[in-house]
């Protein structure tokens, strides 16, 4: 069930964990405490915060440090993944280190359990969907491209295999389904996600919900082939299409 953070907080479902999710923060060097108040408010509404990549604008150290300062306002566990913007300056490991020291549990082939709910994820990669998914055929460059998508998907699978929970949340940056890309130009669908991740999600019955970002002009809600709910929580989608600052779900 999706809950607007603007209304009064309902009682959580029995044994449920309230998860807030948001992606595409795009923190820049000139920003000053851009999310401190929001993180403090999320801490009052949710039990866990999931960040779905593009946490910084260009993957610069000062940007990560600004976000790290704001994360100190979070009084709840924070899990998340990096996005393509966090790789732009060629130092994603440094961005990850800064955010890890600020308390972010990075999902990059790892898995975490919080109050009985499992969390797994990865950045993900591109490649397309269905019959139009790119295959490893032809030039070496194409094969390298596809291999990058395969390796990212293996990180997700590795994390999921670590979990034995009946309730699992998947967090990625790129989309695992085509549904949540509706609204984007069809020509760029292959560059917004990969069906490989959706197929992996469907192999693990414990997965109850998945969050991603990246598709700023996409749709809010979709499903995998097995029916697992998938939500595009990129900030522009939440603000424009749903009228909320963060998604909030009982899992």
Question: What feature does the model see in each segment?
Answer:
Residues 21-23, 49-54, 78-84, 105-109, ...:
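Active-site neighborhood of phospho(di)ester-bond hydrolases with catalytic His/Asp-centered motifs
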């Amino acid at each position: 069930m999706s809950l607007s953070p603007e209304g009064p907080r309902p009682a959580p479902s029995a044994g449920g964990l309230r998860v807030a999710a948001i992606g595409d923060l795009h923190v820049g060097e000139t920003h000053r405490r851009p999310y401190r108040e929001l993180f403090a408010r999320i801490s009052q509404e949710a039990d866990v915060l999931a960040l779905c990549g593009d946490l910084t604008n260009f993957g610069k150290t000062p940007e990560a440090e600004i976000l790290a300062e704001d994360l100190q306002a979070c009084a709840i566990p924070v899990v998340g993944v990096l996005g393509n913007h966090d790789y732009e300056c060629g130092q994603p490991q440094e961005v990850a280190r800064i955010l890890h020291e600020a308390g972010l549990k990075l999902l990059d082939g790892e898995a975490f359990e919080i109050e009985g709910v499992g969390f797994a994820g990865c950045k993900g990669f591109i490649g397309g969907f269905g019959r139009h998914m790119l295959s490893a055929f032809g030039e070496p460059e194409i094969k390298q491209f596809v291999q990058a998508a395969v390796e990212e998907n293996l990180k997700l699978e590795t994390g999921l295999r670590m979990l034995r929970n009946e309730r699992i949340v998947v967090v990625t940056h790129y989309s695992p389904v085509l549904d949540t890309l509706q609204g984007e130009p069809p020509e760029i669908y292959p560059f917004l996600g990969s069906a490989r991740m959706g197929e992996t999600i469907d192999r693990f019955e414990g997965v109850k919900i998945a969050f991603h970002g990246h598709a700023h002009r996409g749709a809010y809600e979709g499903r995998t082939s097995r029916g697992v709910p998938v939500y595009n929580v990129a900030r522009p989608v939440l603000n424009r299409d749903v009228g909320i600052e963060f998604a909030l779900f009982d899992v």
